[in-house]
């Protein structure tokens, strides 16, 4: 039920839709002679669009989330790489049979890079179809085609195709992967999406190492107008509002323990300070080895593995 309510609520309040609804309402009430109310709602509609498309509001809202989890030094050993869905054009791929990526496609490209760095690591992809009315191919269905093209064998993949949102991503993966206590799993998702994702994994007692990708801000936008293409600014604002609403809603229903989970909220993460599992400090020699990247060192020319039949 919460899934359907969240989709309906978001459809109503996302900036572009809300502006259209307010404009339609202003025209309707004006027809009944309530011109002052109609004028106020029309003004509200204009302000929503202007702030969303012509200012840096979206970047200012999104940047704190992107900066929450800096990328740590590469761990020496990795048991698996988790990739959360949201990187493919589902409707296009369903119609054309390809693997077209969207702005979140960095998730899967980075996963392929990590797959080369850690050749023994499993790659767990989670992503079904999370829309109410639009048809599309789930990311976990499309991902094997892209990975095969990039030289990642199908035998390394763990595919979770049923989840519709981040909460279901985590719950389904926890049951499917069943990680061992001493294993290290990298979590690859968009930087702005990392706080909510890590909060869910912590709640599920599934320790992960945050590996953020797909940054949408430079961190230098500042307060101003016309700092980006209006269409991109509108998309950034929409993304930021959606993520903040998601964080607040998940905290309200108890799915995460804080509104904006961070690296210092709990142990079980490998961070830039060299903290190991359980929050213990690594000895200086081990910490230096970790920061050198272990398996992340240069491995010479790339020789793609054979794709499994």
Predicted feature locations:
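A structural signal for short, hydrophobic/glycine-enriched beta-strand patches
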Residues: 46, 51-237, 309
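Compositionally biased, proline/threonine/alanine/serine-rich low-complexity intrinsically disordered stretches
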Residues: 264-309
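Membrane-interface helix-boundary motifs at transmembrane edges
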Residues: 30-38
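Membrane-embedded alpha-helical segments of integral membrane proteins
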Residues: 1-30
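Structured C-terminal subdomain patch of bacterial secreted/periplasmic proteins
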Residues: 231-264, 272
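Hydrophobic alpha-helical transmembrane segments of polytopic
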Residues: 22, 41, 45-48, 242
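Hydrophobic alpha-helical segments of integral membrane proteins
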Residues: 1-9, 57, 61-65, 241-248
């Amino acid at each position: 039920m919460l899934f359907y309510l969240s989709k309906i609520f978001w459809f109503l309040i996302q900036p572009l839709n809300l502006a259209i609804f307010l404009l339609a309402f202003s025209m309707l009430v004006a027809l009944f002679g309530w011109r002052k109310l109609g004028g106020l709602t029309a003004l509200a509609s204009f302000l929503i669009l202007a702030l969303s498309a012509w200012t840096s509001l979206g970047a200012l809202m999104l940047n704190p989330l992107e900066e929450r989890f800096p990328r740590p030094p590469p761990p020496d050993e990795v048991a698996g790489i988790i990739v959360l869905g949201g990187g493919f054009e589902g409707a296009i791929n369903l119609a054309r049979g390809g693997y077209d990526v969207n702005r979140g496609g960095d998730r899967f490209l980075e996963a392929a890079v990590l797959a080369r760095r850690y050749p023994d690591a499993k790659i767990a992809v989670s992503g079904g179809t999370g829309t109410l009315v639009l048809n599309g191919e789930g990311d976990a269905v499309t991902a094997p085609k892209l990975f095969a093209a990039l030289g990642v064998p199908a035998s390394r993949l763990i595919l979770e195709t049923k989840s519709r949102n981040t909460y279901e991503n985590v719950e389904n993966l926890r049951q499917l992967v069943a990680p061992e206590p001493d294993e290290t799993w990298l979590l690859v998702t968009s930087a702005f999406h990392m706080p909510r994702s890590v909060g869910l994994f912590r709640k599920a007692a599934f320790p992960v190492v945050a590996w953020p990708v797909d940054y949408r801000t430079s961190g230098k936008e500042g307060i101003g107008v016309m700092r980006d293409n209006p269409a991109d600014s509108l998309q950034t604002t929409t993304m930021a509002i959606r993520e903040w609403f998601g964080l607040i809603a998940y905290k309200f229903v108890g799915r995460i323990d804080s509104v904006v989970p961070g690296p210092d909220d709990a142990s079980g993460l490998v961070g830039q300070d060299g903290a190991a599992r359980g929050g213990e400090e690594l000895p200086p020699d081990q910490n230096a080895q970790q920061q050198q990247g272990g398996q992340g060192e240069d491995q010479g020319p790339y020789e793609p593995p054979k794709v499994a039949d």
